[in-house]
């Protein structure tokens, strides 16, 4: 059992995720408290298991959080977003944002589906509206029939929201300024992404392999809010249900 636990820690699973995954799959496991005790005992012996734990620092505002001069034309407020999006009962409602590299150079576009917490990540050479809209469209086009809405903050990088909405056949909404809690899942995801790409990381050195690795790790971690299923499991199940439903209607 401990061999499995240590393997999952190496995959950046938290002790609670490991314990919950054991229980959810009917396997004999250990409590998350016992895992923490083993980690700290290992640290006292000079071990390195503690390095697998996520850093619990006080959240700071993201760089550029207040670079919101001017108004994006034709914005649609989150206040007009259907209530079903808040309920998280419909598959295909997405949140989006950007994560900035060191010295504000280059960025990552991050998207997550609200019901499954499934995330998509793309690197952009600059945080321009053109580059960001290209990335969003590229990421979501394979799932275009499962994109009902997209909600972002008021960053100017989302100025081409009408192009994104038109291309994907989706509705685009903007959260209130400085109200990150209105996109809580995406904000949380960005914090997890920083585990792989810290604030001091220069994004010009990031490869597609690095991004694929981060997405794989994040989408294959069991989540307590998903009954300790992984985002990948929930997303793929919903995707298959959607496609089967469409097939039956044709």
Predicted regions and their residues:
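Secondary-structure boundary/capping micro-motif
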Residues: 1-177, 181-185, 190-202, 216, ...
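Conserved active-site loop/cleft motifs that coordinate metal ions or position small ligands
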Residues: 204-205, 226-229
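Catalytic phosphate/metal-binding cores of nucleic-acid and nucleotide-processing enzymes, i.e., regions
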Residues: 210
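Charge-patterned, long linear interaction tracts outside catalytic cores
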Residues: 230-250
């Amino acid at each position: 059992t401990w061999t499995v636990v240590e393997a999952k820690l190496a995959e950046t699973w938290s002790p609670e995720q490991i314990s919950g995954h054991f229980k959810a799959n009917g396997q004999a496991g250990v409590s998350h408290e016992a895992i923490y005790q083993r980690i700290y005992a290992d640290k006292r012996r000079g071990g390195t298991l503690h390095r697998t734990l996520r850093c619990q620092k006080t959240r700071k505002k993201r760089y550029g959080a207040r670079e919101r001069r001017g108004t994006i034309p034709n914005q649609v407020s989150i206040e007009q977003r259907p209530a079903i999006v808040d309920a998280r009962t419909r598959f295909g409602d997405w949140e989006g944002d950007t994560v900035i590299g060191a010295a504000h150079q280059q960025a990552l576009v991050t998207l997550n589906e609200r019901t499954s917490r499934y995330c998509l990540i793309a690197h952009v050479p600059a945080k321009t509206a053109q580059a960001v809209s290209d990335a969003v469209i590229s990421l979501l086009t394979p799932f275009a029939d499962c994109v009902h809405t997209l909600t972002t903050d008021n960053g100017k990088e989302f100025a081409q929201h009408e192009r994104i909405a038109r291309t994907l056949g989706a509705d685009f909404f903007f959260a209130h300024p400085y109200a990150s809690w209105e996109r809580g899942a995406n904000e949380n995801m960005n914090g997890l992404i920083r585990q792989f790409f810290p604030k001091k990381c220069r994004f010009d050195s990031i490869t597609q392999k690095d991004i694929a690795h981060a997405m794989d790790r994040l989408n294959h971690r069991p989540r307590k809010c998903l009954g300790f299923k992984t985002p990948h499991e929930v997303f793929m199940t919903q995707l298959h249900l959607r496609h089967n439903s469409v097939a039956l209607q044709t």
